[in-house]
Amino acid sequence: MLDWIETRPIVKALLENERNSNSGKYNGERCFLTAYQIAILVDKENPEVRGKLPIGGKGVGPDSFSRQIAWHLSQEIDGEYFEGKLEIGFFSQSGLEDFTFDGGHQPSLNEFSMFRLREI
């Protein structure tokens, strides 16, 4: 089980610091990150947080690190911790069957939630 109180500040810092690097009009704006990306980035820097939970992806099932992060973040949309800046979006599933990642992982073809912190 995920300790959200321990994980939440790590996720908030990731969302605060993830900005696009385009050189155009939108340079430096905060980007959306999928729950899967957040899980990978948290695990990369803080592997003890994930514990024995699988990261997620195709065939892993509902009890994964990325699913728990997505659930907790979705509960925080209107909460005070993220100061009303947390935004959720959904990535189209079209074409995802062709995605592959290092280690042979494939994304789940369920809803693909994405999160970012709005600039206010």
PLM segments and residue spans:
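Phospho-regulated, low-complexity intrinsically disordered regions of nuclear gene-regulatory
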Residues: 1-29, 36, 48-120
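An amphipathic alpha-helix signature
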Residues: 32-43
